[in-house]
Amino acid sequence: MKPISAYDFPVSVLIDLHTDALYEHMCGRKDITQRSDKGHLDFARMKEGGVNGQIFAVWGSPTELKPGEYRDFALKGTNAFDEVCARCADAVAPVRTPDEFRQVTAAGRIAAILGVEGGHALEGRLENLDRFYERGVRVLTVTWSNSNELGDSSSDEDKPHNGLSSLGRQAVRRMNELGMIIDVSHSADKTVFDTLDASLSPVIASHSGIRARRDFNRNLTDEQIRAIAAHGGVIGVVFLPYFLRETEDRATIEDVLECIDHICQIAGPDHAGHPG
């Protein structure tokens, strides 16, 4: 019997909303330009899986970097992004606009979208947002596992800003002006709602779980899911066991599908997405 392939299904556009693979590549843990059975993905396996578009996240860990190094590490990531795309130009191309996305995917190549995960990369300066945009960044995740100058993280018990900060609201408005995608995965509950309130454009949660299924502060409540959907946004269900189920048993594809179904039931199928 012939193995099932992604290409056996009706034609559609498949976009993976989040991967840390570029960070792994930067750190020398994996070469995503070469096929491998290790790690989340590489270009060869993406092609085999029928992936049309991929958001590559660059993030600098505050536990590994010092304040003042965050922006430069993110800029280093933009260079790494350009380098891997150039090495595999026959299979993948960086895209910065919807028209470029359509052109690249129509040509049968993977559209690579660059993101920065964690507003701490701005180091409290809005001009760094413009710098990132000029370097091709089109997605910014407001927080990572740490609160920053833009707002509070779901992982931070202190919540210093009580949601989105004044600078965070300015950053949201600037991203709206630039046409960037705003990502609220990792954000504290109030940061999510404040971001939705401040943004004139749809907002995504690129890699989150469902709190109704797994009571975990990184996961979204039903109220947040409905609010993101009402704003025209999309939620990507994260493929990590401790986001998907309460028990410590190994998660299965059924757990992922049940989370996607939950979003479809309370917000509609247009708002359920696929992360890495």
Regions found by a protein language model. Give the residues of each.
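Short N-terminal signal/transit or membrane-insertion segments
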Residues: 69-77, 163-171, 200-217
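Alpha-helix-loop-beta-strand connector modules within alpha/beta enzyme cores
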Residues: 85-86, 160-178, 195-205, 266
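Histidine-centered catalytic micro-motifs
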Residues: 14-22, 187, 205-209
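N-terminal hydrophobic targeting/anchoring segments and the immediately downstream early-domain regions
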Residues: 1-159, 215-275
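Aromatic-anchored, glycine/proline-accented short structural segments
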Residues: 190-233
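Metal-dependent enolase-superfamily TIM-barrel catalytic cores that perform enediolate-based chemistry
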Residues: 135-189
